[in-house]
């Protein structure tokens, strides 16, 4: 006979106030046992173990020990939260890392609830002591084994203190339904680890059995009449083929392993689903996984500069799959595996009214795949509403993990819906096996999972309603035999512990408006941020206020309300059209008794959607640029980067390793003199020809040409001696005859015999007397050196008759010759101060001006080495410096080529691009940086636009501006380590000495740092990208940009080509006939008509929910147009300098010029009018009308419509004058253009049209080039280039005319005519020119500057400025 006892807890801490517990005798039996010793309570699932724990807690609290508290430990976050909600005083989550926080949290409490890990960390850090606790409760105590954190608590802390004699340790209470994990032998292990003994009710065991409903166990085997699903899904088959071809590409095993990590794991999971569930499920899983992965990668592309080779490689591989086909809604029998068909059959048979079931599977991926299959299969789709559960641990895969589609944030909601009955089936892993409170089920299925005794008992325990069933789908005939063995083991366990099932009473739920208003919220687990319903309206208004502001546009949310037949309200909120159509309209989730509540609910639903779209961050404030940058990023004006790469360190190492040697032919071309031919020998190969200008004087330039190397075998010792001989001619003080291990060798010949002959012939010196007696010619003379006093060597110039006088007698004491001192210069790479010595009489000689002078023969001796080799030694610092730069460029080329399809050809451009501070190459560098800047803006704008289709233009612009700023680009270089390639060291010729292998310091693990300005680093990045474009075109530049700036992805346009972006476009935005006229005007036919509509939709159009406004397309189109202009200028780069190109770009892309284009661009069409007079005669009249682009503008602002019409009407005459100046007067009318006024909407639609055509044409620039031609931008640009028409801004021109003078402008209002302004242009406070007019400040300043320029060029106003 069953009996029970009522136990009332009156406002006891740790329990719900006035909570009534119905206590059964077997529970009291367990309570009494726990008061005697450390105990593990073993009772079946659902029989009230938690009540035993509560009784034990209350008994402990009743002792009145105010200094101690009870700690309840749970294995999972979900379970600990569940226990906290029902009974606890304080729930302690993870992450508190401050003792003060712990002390404050535990102050005055009686019960603490946490996971095992939280307590273990707190004990390990010393934040909490076991002596503070009176009772330690382990829920799901069977986990206390091996390396489980529950066992660590006992072994590391409890047992260790117990063995050391500590007395005041807490009592232990364990709770479990099955004290074993695998077999019966683990029982004693658990008891030993917890220092407790397992007990189960004995005296009241019969009563325990009365509260247990055991399900009918039904083992099932598949009938293999269904075709075997051994064929792979088409996507899987295609992906296998791509990977097979990729395996043939040579690559290092380490790199290949990194690249294939993600894609192979995904393949293994997909193959497992293909085998377990069949083709349909595998196809659906792969298709959705790939789409989710691509979208996540695009959304996160700009967040970090750290490359993930595996994910980037996976992205590139998956892009090659092309457009993925949707699964067929009609599932064919051959698309289902036999085991899965068996599962579907059993599910359909088991279904009855009030069905409530679980399906256990092995893999996380199988959970979703099976859910989709059940929801789409004709046998089950109409019977089940499915949810999924995989656990609440926050240690989940990244959002960009290929194959990870689970969102743990939705799982609490899944359990809640299951309890309410809106879901009747959950697909799960072992996460729902134990602990978490779910309603009693009437059907549980185990699908192809190997059961242990523990999992058998736990899963069967979930089916505890009356007449429930536990269906086990088995693979083969061995399954039933194994099941029998488990049942026998359970009988043995029951005999030992008298175990049975448990039952939980679900918590009561309130269902009225006030409670719902309090309970509805948006919670962010990561940050703890929470938005409750009553605050949602304020948050939504704040979000809208952060959207880009624009005239005639209200960014406030608009609420409307509906009242149903029962007097309850629903609200709809409409958000500004700057947002994506999917984010423009939201309804309240239910009807409410008060209009205020409906409004708050709609606002909350809107804010949830904005958060899911990434427009609100984890702190529930509008997303900022910083949210998409690394957390610790700080943009600075200067960055500490690695020291400049020293290629001589590698050269020195190669010399020491006796590597293959390469000879490079070196020619020095000397105008009006013989060329010098040598060989430079290096242990590495330069694979490009290097041209090195050597500036001798203002009029003379030599050219050193170093050709690609070829392998040689030669006597190194001889080569070193020859090199030493050449170097000693100039660097005698730095050259030793003992240490000859030069980093490079210079020799005139490669044959050993000729080298020996060279040494024998030219080593040493000879007296001048002896040389003159041999009647040697000056060209054969070496350097003259004085015996008597230290001085620079002398060069003997070629002479003509009469310039050298030699006496007839043999004993010569003096002679006259044309000589000069050898120059001190060692740097011939720059003009230096040569310009100051400009002369009309230029001589191509090394040294000072030669003079005829009389010299004592005895005072001099002569080097046997001809002086031309001394010239080579003089040029060597300059040549070796350029070789060093090219070697650095060659190493950088190798890094860039890893991602480039096209091999680099112009390494000379790369050598210039890495020298941002070089004066000699400044013009070319600026040209490359100019090109690279525009190209990166174009690419990044496209990437942001495509990857973040839900982001508004303000966020896109901010992120682009921040990332492509000098600091953003510099930070990328700083992180990537590519800063070592930047050349900041200039040649110091006077300190140069021949480099020795023994004197070169080896590379150190601790790289030295140097401070470089952010602008310098950014300029290098742009120039390298510009060099890539100049060398190999768009593809090479894009690949290079992705290396220099890793946030810029080489696959940034993939969503256009695989159909992903097209799925984000609105359907049926407008009938195609509505834009035919617009297409005819533009000369372009849109494939996606919604793009044409969007490009003409003003932000004032709120509530259409068809497209977003044109702001996003305008953002993209501005960069596209800029690149079109820059690429056109690049094709004419030979005829203009970078400053001129920058001026032209500004002139043809600024907003006022685009406004002018919008006003003047039109098409004249004929219209036929049929009139019928009173006599019924038909008259046909033909009239003409002008179709203009702004005629198609969609707007909802009467004020803007009126102002736009007035503006166009007033500007028509001004536009004609501007057109005349542009085409006829060959003059860029800055003043007239600016005077047109600021009608931003017109320039915006020009840019948005470029953006629309670019996207519609699949990022085809040719279509945009044609549009620029059609609009008249390219013809006008060509006109300005061919006629060399200046486009410099008047202010810039005035400042250029007056270098060093301070130019300023003074504006005052005419006192007689208050509407008139007077502006004076001043140079150092002296007036140059003044103008008057009725215009704004900016225009009148431009007019004053223009007038001043005109006067100065005509010679006026010079006296005032002199």
UniProtKB/Swiss-Prot annotation:
Protein name, UniProt field: Dicer-like protein 2-2
Q: Where is this motif: DEAH box?
A: 139-142
* Record-annotated Helicase C-terminal domain positions: 343-505
Please list the residue ranges annotated as the Dicer dsRNA-binding fold domain.
536-630
The Swiss-Prot or TrEMBL record describes its family as follows:
Belongs to the helicase family. Dicer subfamily.
Q: Which PROSITE patterns does the record cross-reference, listed alphabetically? A: DICER_DSRBF, HELICASE_ATP_BIND_1, HELICASE_CTER, RNASE_3_2
State the GO CC annotations.
Answer: cytoplasm; nucleus
**Keywords, comma-separated and alphabetical:** Antiviral defense, Antiviral protein, ATP-binding, Helicase, Hydrolase, Nucleotide-binding, Repeat, RNA-binding
SMART domains membership: DEXDc, HELICc, RIBOc
Main function: Dicer-like endonuclease involved in cleaving double-stranded RNA in the RNA interference (RNAi) pathway. Produces 21 to 25 bp dsRNAs (siRNAs) which target the selective destruction of homologous RNAs leading to sequence-specific suppression of gene expression, called post-transcriptional gene silencing (PTGS). Part of a broad host defense response against viral infection and transposons.
Question: Domain RNase III spans what residues?
Answer: 889-1033, 1075-1258
Q: Name the positions where ATP binds.
A: 43-50
Q: Which organism is it from?
A: Aspergillus niger (strain ATCC MYA-4892 / CBS 513.88 / FGSC A1513)
What EC number(s) are associated with this protein in UniProt? 3.1.26.-, 3.6.4.-
The record's section on InterPro entries has: DEAD/DEAH_box_helicase_dom, Dicer_dimer_sf, Dicer_dimerisation_dom, Helicase_ATP-bd, Helicase_C-like, P-loop_NTPase, RNase_III_dom, RNase_III_sf
Kindly list the biological process annotations in GO that this record carries: defense response to virus; regulation of defense response to virus; siRNA processing
**What are the Helicase ATP-binding domain coordinates in residue numbering?**
30-197
User: What's one Pfam family the UniProt record gives for this protein?
Assistant: Helicase_C
């Amino acid at each position: 006979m069953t009996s029970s006892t009522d136990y009332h807890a009156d406002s006891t801490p740790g329990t719900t106030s006035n909570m009534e517990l119905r206590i059964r005798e077997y529970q009291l039996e367990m309570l009494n046992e726990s008061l005697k010793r450390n105990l593990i309570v073993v009772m079946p699932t659902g029989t009230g173990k938690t009540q035993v724990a509560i009784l034990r807690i209350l008994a402990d609290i009743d002792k009145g020990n105010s200094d101690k508290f009870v700690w309840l430990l749970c294995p999972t976050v979900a379970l600990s939260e569940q226990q906290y909600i029902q009974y606890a005083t304080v729930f302690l989550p993870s992450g508190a890392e401050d003792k003060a926080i712990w002390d404050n949290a535990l102050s005055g409490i009686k019960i603490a609830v946490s996971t095992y890990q939280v307590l273990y960390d707190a004990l390990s850090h010393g934040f909490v002591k076991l002596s503070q606790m009176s009772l330690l409760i382990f829920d799901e105590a069977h986990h206390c084994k091996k390396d489980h954190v529950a066992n660590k608590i006992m072994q590391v802390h409890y047992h260790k203190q117990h063995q050391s004699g500590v007395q005041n340790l807490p009592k232990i209470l364990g709770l479990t339904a099955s004290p074993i994990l695998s077999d019966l032998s683990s029982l004693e292990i658990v008891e030993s680890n917890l220092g407790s003994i397992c007990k189960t009710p004995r005296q009241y065991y019969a009563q325990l059995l009365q509260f247990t409903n055991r399900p009918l166990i039904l083992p099932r085997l598949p009938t293999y009449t269904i075709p075997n699903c051994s064929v792979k899904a088409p996507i899987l088959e295609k992906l296998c083929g791509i990977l097979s071809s990729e395996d043939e590409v040579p690559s290092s095993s380490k790199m290949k392993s990194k690249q294939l990590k993600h894609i192979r794991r995904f393949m293994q999971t997909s193959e497992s689903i293909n085998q377990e569930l069949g083709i349909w499920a595998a196809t659906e899983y792969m298709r959705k996984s790939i789409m989710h992965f691509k979208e996540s990668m695009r959304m996160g592309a700009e967040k970090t500069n750290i490359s993930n080779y595996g994910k980037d490689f996976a992205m590139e591989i998956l892009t090659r799959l092309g457009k993925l086909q949707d699964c067929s809604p009609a599932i064919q029998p051959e698309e289902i595996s036999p085991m899965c068909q068996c599962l579907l059959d059993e599910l359909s048979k088991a279904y009855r009214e009030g069905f409530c079931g679980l399906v256990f599977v092995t893999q996380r991926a199988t959970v979703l795949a099976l859910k989709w299959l059940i929801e789409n299969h004709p046998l089950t789709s109409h019977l089940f509403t499915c949810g999924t559960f995989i656990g609440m641990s926050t240690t989940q895969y990244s959002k960009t993990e290929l194959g990870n589609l689970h969102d743990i944030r939705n799982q609490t909601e899944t359990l809640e819906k299951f309890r309410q009955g809106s879901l009747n089936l959950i697909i799960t892993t072992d996460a729902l096996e134990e602990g978490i409170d779910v309603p009693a089920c009437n059907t549980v299925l185990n699908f192809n999972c190997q059961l242990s005794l523990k999992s058998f008992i736990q899963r069967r325990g979930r089916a505890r309603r009356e007449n429930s069933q536990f269906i086990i789908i088995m693979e083969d005939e061995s399954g039933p035999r194994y099941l029998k063995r488990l049942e026998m083991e359970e009988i043995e366990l029951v005999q030992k512990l008298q175990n049975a099932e448990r039952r939980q009473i679900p918590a009561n739920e309130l269902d009225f408006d006030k409670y719902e208003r309090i309970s509805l919220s948006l919670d962010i687990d990561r940050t703890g941020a929470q938005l409750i319903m009553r605050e949602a309206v304020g948050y939504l208004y704040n979000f809208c206020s952060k959207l880009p502001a624009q005239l005639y546009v209200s960014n406030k949310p608009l609420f409307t309300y509906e009242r149903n037949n029962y007097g309850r309200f629903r609200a709809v909120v409409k958000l500004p059209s700057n947002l994506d159509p999917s984010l423009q309209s939201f309804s309240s989730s239910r009807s409410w008794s008060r209009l205020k509540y409906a409004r708050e609910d709609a606002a909350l639903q809107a804010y949830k959607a904005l958060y899911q779209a990434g427009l609100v961050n984890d702190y529930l404030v509008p997303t900022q640029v910083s949210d998409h940058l690394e957390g610790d990023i700080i943009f600075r004006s200067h960055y500490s980067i690695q020291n400049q790469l020293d290629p001589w360190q590698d050269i020195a190492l190669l010399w020491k390793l006796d590597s293959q040697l390469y000879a490079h032919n070196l020619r020095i071309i000397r105008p009006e003199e013989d060329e010098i031919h040598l060989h430079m020998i290096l242990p590495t190969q330069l694979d490009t020809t290097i041209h090195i200008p050597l500036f001798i004087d203002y009029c003379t330039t030599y050219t050193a040409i170093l050709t690609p190397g070829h392998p040689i075998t030669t006597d190194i010792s001889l080569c070193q001696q020859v090199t030493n001989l050449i170097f000693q001619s100039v660097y005698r003080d730095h050259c030793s005859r003992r240490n000859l291990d030069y980093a490079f060798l210079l020799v005139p010949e490669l044959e050993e015999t000729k080298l020996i002959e060279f040494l024998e012939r030219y080593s040493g010196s000879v007296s001048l007397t002896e040389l003159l007696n041999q009647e040697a010619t000056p060209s054969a003379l070496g350097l003259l050196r004085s015996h008597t006093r230290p001085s620079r060597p002398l060069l003997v110039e070629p002479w003509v008759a009469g310039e050298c006088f030699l006496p007839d007698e043999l004993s010569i004491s003096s002679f006259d010759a044309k000589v000069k001192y050898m120059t001190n210069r060692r740097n011939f790479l720059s003009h230096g101060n040569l310009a100051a010595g400009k002369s009309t009489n230029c001589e191509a000689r090394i040294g000072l001006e030669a003079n005829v002078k009389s010299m004592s023969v005895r005072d001099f001796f002569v080097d046997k080495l001809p002086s031309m080799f001394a010239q080579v030694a003089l040029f060597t610092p300059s040549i070796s410096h350029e070789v060093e730069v090219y070697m650095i460029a060659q190493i950088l080329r190798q890094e860039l080529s890893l991602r480039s399809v096209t091999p680099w050809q112009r390494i000379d451009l790369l050598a210039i691009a890495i020298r941002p501070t070089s004066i000699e190459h400044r013009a070319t560098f600026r040209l490359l940086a100019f090109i690279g800047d525009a190209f990166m803006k174009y690419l990044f704008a496209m990437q942001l636009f495509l990857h973040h289709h839900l982001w508004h233009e303000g966020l896109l612009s901010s992120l682009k501006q921040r990332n492509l700023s000098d600091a953003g680009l510099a930070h990328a270089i700083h992180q990537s380590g590519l800063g070592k390639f930047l050349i900041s060291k200039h040649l110091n010729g006077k300190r140069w000495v021949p480099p020795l292998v023994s004197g070169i310091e080896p590379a150190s693990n601790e790289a030295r740092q140097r401070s470089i300005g952010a602008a310098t680093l950014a300029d290098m990045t742009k120039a390298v990208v510009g060099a890539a474009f100049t060398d190999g075109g768009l593809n090479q530049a894009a690949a290079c940009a992705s290396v220099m700036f890793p946030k810029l992805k080489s696959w940034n346009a993939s969503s256009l080509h695989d159909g992903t972006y097209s799925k984000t476009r609105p359907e049926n935005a407008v009938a195609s006939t509505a834009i035919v006229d617009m297409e005819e005007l533009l000369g372009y036919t849109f494939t996606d008509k919604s793009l044409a509509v969007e490009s003409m939709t003003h932000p004032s159009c709120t509530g259409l929910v068809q497209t977003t406004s044109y702001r996003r397309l305008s953002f993209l189109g501005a960069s596209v147009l800029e690149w079109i202009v820059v690429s056109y200028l690049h094709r004419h780069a030979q005829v203009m300098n970078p400053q001129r190109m920058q001026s032209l770009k500004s002139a043809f892309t600024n907003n006022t010029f685009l406004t002018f284009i919008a006003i003047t661009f039109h098409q004249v069409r004929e219209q036929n009018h049929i009139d019928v007079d009173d006599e019924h005669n038909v008259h046909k009249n033909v009239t003409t009308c002008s179709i203009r682009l702004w005629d198609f503008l969609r707007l909802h602002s009467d004020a803007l419509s009126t102002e736009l019409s007035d503006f166009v009407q007033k500007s028509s005459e001004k536009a004609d004058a501007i057109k005349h100046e542009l085409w006829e007067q060959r003059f860029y009318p800055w003043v007239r253009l600016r005077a047109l006024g600021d009608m931003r909407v017109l320039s915006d639609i020009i840019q948005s049209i470029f953006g629309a055509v670019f996207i519609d044409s699949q990022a085809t620039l040719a279509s945009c080039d044609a549009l620029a031609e059609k609009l008249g931008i390219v013809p006008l640009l060509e006109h300005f280039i061919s006629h060399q028409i200046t486009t410099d801004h008047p202010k810039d021109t005035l400042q250029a005319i007056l270098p060093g003078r301070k130019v300023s402008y003074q504006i005052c209002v005419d006192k007689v005519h208050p509407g008139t302004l007077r502006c004076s242009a001043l140079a150092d406070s002296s007036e140059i020119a003044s103008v008057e007019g009725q215009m704004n400040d900016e225009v009148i300043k431009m007019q004053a500057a223009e007038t001043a320029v005109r006067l100065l060029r005509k010679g006026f106003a010079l006296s005032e400025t002199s």
